[in-house]
From Swiss-Prot:
It comes from Vibrio cholerae serotype O1 (strain ATCC 39315 / El Tor Inaba N16961). It catalyses: Exonucleolytic cleavage in the 3'- to 5'-direction to yield nucleoside 5'-phosphates. This is Ribonuclease R. GO terms for molecular function: exoribonuclease II activity; RNA binding. Pfam families: CSD2, HTH_12, OB_RNB, RNB, S1. Keywords: Cytoplasm, Exonuclease, Hydrolase, Nuclease, RNA-binding.
Amino acid sequence: MSDTTHLDPFADREADNYDNPIPSREYILEFLTQANVPMNRNDLFEALKLEGEEQYEGLRRRLRAMERDGQLVFTRRQCYALPEKLEMVKGYVIGHKDGHGWVRPEGSLNKEGDILLPHHQMRTLIHGDFVLVQPSGTDKRGRKEGRLVRILEERNGQIVGRFFFEYGYSYVVPDDSRIHHDILIPNDLRAGARMGNVVVIEITDRGTRNRGMMGKVVEVLGENMAPGMETQIAIRTHQIPHEWPAEVEQQVAGLTEEVPEEAKQGRVDLRALPLVTIDGEDARDFDDAVYCEAKKGGGWRLWVAIADVSYYVRPDTALDKEAINRGNSVYFPSQVVPMLPEVLSNGLCSLNPQVDRLCMVCEMTVSETGKLSGYKHYEAVMNSHARLTYTKVHEILEGDEELRERYKALVPHLEELHKMYQVLKSARDERGAIEFETVETKFIFNAQRKIESIEPVVRNDAHKLIEECMILANIASASLVEKAKEAALYRVHEPPGEERLTGFRDFLGELGLDLSGGLEPSPTDYANLMKQIGERPDKELIQTMLLRSMKQAVYNADNAGHFGLALKRYAHFTSPIRRYPDLLLHRAIKYLIAKQEGRNQDRWTPTGGYHYSFDDMDFYGEQCSMTERRADDATREVSDWLKCEYMQDHVGEELEGVVANVTSFGFFVRLTELHIDGLVHISTLANDYYHYDPIGQRLVGESFGAIYRLGDAVKVKVLAVNLDDRQIDFELVETSRKLRGQGKTAKKRADEARAKAQGKKEAATKGACGKSPTKSELKPQVEATRRPDSEGRSKPKKTKAPKKRKDQARKKSGKVRDKTK
């Protein structure tokens, strides 16, 4: 054994694993860090004081493995070096439909640090690959560019696409536009796929820079336009687990819909308490039930009973492992991919009416001013007295006589809930929580599963009442685990970053609005802004820009508060049937209850509680945040597809809308009735040169003074629908804004915007090249009425003509196609 053994903190582990151990990976990395120079294998062998051929071979294998995993880089001088010392970056590939790609550094959540990979660097890469790249300068547009060093981990999972057979060759065009390669399929591996079928494939050969990729068909999904196909594509494209492993099927095989009598023992009996569930009409899994009563001295006592999933789903079981893998249920417009099997999610765990169910209860006291003055958690058994809907409760509160008579025993309790809600709402407003009134839409399907209509979802007081009750239970639960210093996941929403905040303030300034609070505005400052825009016709668009300026909420083991709700602590407790973080919190709370009562056994309790480490929570936080984003991306993609399918029947129609977003290549219009967005491309506007003003969020015509600005009311004609790229193209018919001649103010603003953009470009070019560019090197900032050379929905200025088979592969309908997104 070498003399370095006593210095290696992992020497014992290595000695357990190998007869003739060598230094651990961790020690080698630390050694090279201290050495601060690349070293070849022989020098390392001597420096680590290793001996003999066996240890030399062991070192060779370890260094190769560390190189493979991206921990070390083997340089051209035959030396091993640390990637960070060579300014190399590890990250995930994000493909682009035009053929190039980006590498997002590991751990980064936004695109600010992304590195561009040119087209030729992407020939052997696929969206989702984990790679090592070396920055190699900037491109002509000032974007950081990189060179592929090594693929550290190939994208796992399968690819969905359309199958084609031409000139004796079979190939698949991926449905995901971020995968730019057509995949060649040997004819004996097509699995019976027919021309135009949607198929699932696996890559069998990554190919080279001169030869394309190859794969095999593993599943034929069916015809492209079959009902529900958009959901099946999204499930597989986003790698959402949707089939139950055999071990899970075996574990739930013996379950029935009746709670075993022994499971009810030792619990608080709440079956006589008139708890009710209040959900949407389409709900099938009922997580929560509520009951409220007034206190004699003022204020209220509130019971929030939540399905006790942790009793049935124990740590480290097959059910638990699959729940971790899924992270959450995914709700598509016409299908649900549940986190738990249906026998649990819709049966044994669901708080269905008039049946006994196990539950976790958060019993709270609320003061007359809406403050949470006390809480306690316990395990109970309950029996829901009614399955109510938001619509029914709203109508009962509005005085519907028939419903009030049908539920007369529950009406007083519902009215008490409503009184408490009004006080809670006032308290929420007082603390400065930001309340958004965004419009959500709902797809109405006919018997053939085709879209019949798209309708807005109306939120009434019943929705908000339940929301406030759930928020209160989440606050109480977060307070409990924080006070006990128990490892759990918090729902964290951080304040906006400086760059986005500045951009949002510039936008508000153009509208004559202001966000107070200086460099660190509080939630109250945002809430005051929301009050200012309450009656404005462009309220929804301002809210959209506000949301874009915000960071995304995540799950984290470290509590950093919830900015949007203006809370110091917050966690998810109320939906364990459909969210894994809630299940983790239930286990932690059960452990604390058992610990207080002396019933815990080491890290676990008899009824499903468990004590996790903070390292465990770090892992679960990343996993659950990822699965949440995955679900959001998949459902948004399906929603966009369905909107395009619906709009195919409206091509040629003229509809009212509002300018919802402005870019350098045109502006997006949101239809007033349908809440669907489409693009009015700059090339379809009146013949003029248009300048993009990013601060004012507008396009300004140079010659005739035409202005197209965020929030303008317009009428558009549906020009084309592209199902492939989920794009809808509009043509402007008329606008509420009048032309303003030469428009001195408009031209002044455009000149300012152009000068600012020119200054930024000069600075970027000078920074990249070390000298100022010549006049001939600068591109004009004028946008002509053509498809511009820009990202987004525009085509590159210089590209090869598309291949004939590619055009055929992309066609799915007879509608006009325009790949400009």
